[in-house]
UniProtKB/Swiss-Prot annotation:
It comes from Drosophila simulans (Fruit fly). This is Heat shock protein 83. Residues 225-245 have a biased composition (Basic and acidic residues). CDD domains: HATPase_Hsp90-like. ATP binds at residues 39, 81, 100, 126. InterPro entries: HATPase_C_sf, Heat_shock_protein_90_CS, Hsp90_fam, Hsp90_N, Ribosomal_Su5_D2-typ_SF. GO terms for biological process: centrosome cycle; cold acclimation; membrane bending; multivesicular body fusion to apical plasma membrane; negative regulation of cell population proliferation; pole plasm mRNA localization; positive regulation of insulin receptor signaling pathway; positive regulation of neuroblast proliferation.
Length: 375
């Protein structure tokens, strides 16, 4: 029997923000997945840090990962992480009743014409889920509390109740009920494209449940089982008795056995596919990285078939901290002197999450043939 649900009103600024997200047209809706994956990664960081001083924190689940499950039949996209999870008070406070300091600032920025993709910088990235979903449920289990489920269709209120259905062990499961006009976000290819673009260098495995097909060899009678069942059902429905010729039974059976043939059928199955196998080598010490590793990373970053000509890998510490990994390609780009071309090819990341690849202030225009990342 489902537990009694408590209803809470969204804090005024949050309700206003959600209304803005739902009722304004944004073309860049795909950032919702980047934000939810970033939140999942933060939750995984937290449990990992806690486990460094108290390894028993991982007794509720040692494997740290993020899993994406699209379900076209139900029209849902599920994001699961085995991170720190949320207590009941976390769900109530963090997802609705206490506005983060960035809520108002973000709304002001939006109204001033800022891009929706900046939402994560203001600490309210979770609400971007409502760009593509008309209902969201968040089931969460923290080591210090029972499992609870948060639910809202963004109508000014949300509910929280205890959940005894499917134990998570530890972590969070977010189910997005995708809007009818946004179902392309349930396509495997679309999800892979977004993860590859925005979350390729997240420090935990991102697994996608994919549907595949394989060939299976079966004997004719296995393949015909369903047909037999249908015939038997038909006979039961008619009044005519079944006439058997018992005299030739043994001979017929022997012939059947000899004549049994194998046939190949196609069967569908699902399995997890890891989407972020390329690791962010710029976070490592340059002394530990071989030229081959730089070469492989350069090719995966740029889709160039040739090795790079030169590489510069450095970090800056102080008031502003960043790491940079810059490559000079072996060949001059064919459009080097075109005015209309993209101003630079440096990708900007913040904590391994892709932000943009057109930040003109990163390098001067005359160096726009360089490729690389700044994090």
């Amino acid at each position: 029997m489902p537990e009694e649900a408590e209803t809470f009103a969204f804090q005024a600024e949050i309700a206003q923000l959600m209304s803005l997200i739902i009722n304004t047209f944004y073309s860049n809706k795909e950032i919702f997945l980047r934000e939810l994956i970033s939140n999942a990664s933060d939750a995984l960081d937290k449990i990992r840090y806690e486990s460094l001083t108290d390894p028993s924190k991982l007794d509720s689940g040692k494997e740290l990962y993020i899993k994406l499950i699209p379900n076209k039949t139900a029209g849902t996209l599920t994001i699961i992480d085995t991170g720190i999870g949320m207590t009941k008070s976390d769900l109530v406070n963090n997802l609705g009743t206490i506005a983060k300091s960035g809520t108002k600032a973000f709304m002001e920025a939006l109204q001033a014409g800022a891009d929706i993709s900046m939402i994560g910088q203001f600490g309210v990235g979770f609400y971007s889920a409502y760009l593509v979903a008309d209902k969201v449920t968040v089931t969460s289990k923290n080591n210090d509390d029972e499992q609870y489920v948060w639910e809202s269709s963004a109508g000014g209120s949300f509910t929280v109740r205890a959940d005894n259905s499917e134990p998570l062990g530890r972590g969070t499961k977010i189910v997005l009920y995708i809007k009818e006009d946004q179902t392309d976000y349930l396509e495997e290819s679309k999800i892979k494209e977004i993860v590859n673009k925005h979350s390729q260098f997240i420090g935990y495995p991102i697994k996608l449940l994919v549907e595949k097909e394989r060939e299976k060899e079966v004997s004719d009678d296995e393949a015909d089982d369903e047909k037999k069942e249908g015939d038997e059902k038909k006979e039961m429905e008619t009044d005519e008795p079944k006439i058997e010729d018992v005299g030739e039974d043994e001979d017929a059976d022997k012939k059947d056995k000899d004549a049994k043939k194998k046939k190949t059928i196609k069967e569908k199955y699902t399995e997890d596919e890891e989407l972020n196998k390329t690791k962010p080598i710029w976070t490592r010490n340059p002394d530990d990285i071989s030229q081959e590793e730089y070469g492989e990373f350069y090719k995966s970053l740029t889709n160039d078939w040739e090795d790079h000509l030169a590489v510069k890998h450095f970090s800056v510490e102080g008031q502003l901290e960043f790491r940079a990994l810059l490559f000079i390609p072996r060949r001059t780009p064919f459009d080097l002197f075109e005015n209309q071309k993209k101003r630079n090819n440096i990708k900007l990341y913040v904590r391994r999450v892709f932000i943009m690849d057109n930040c003109e202030d990163l390098i001067p225009e005359y160096l726009n043939f360089m490729k690389g990342v700044v994090d």
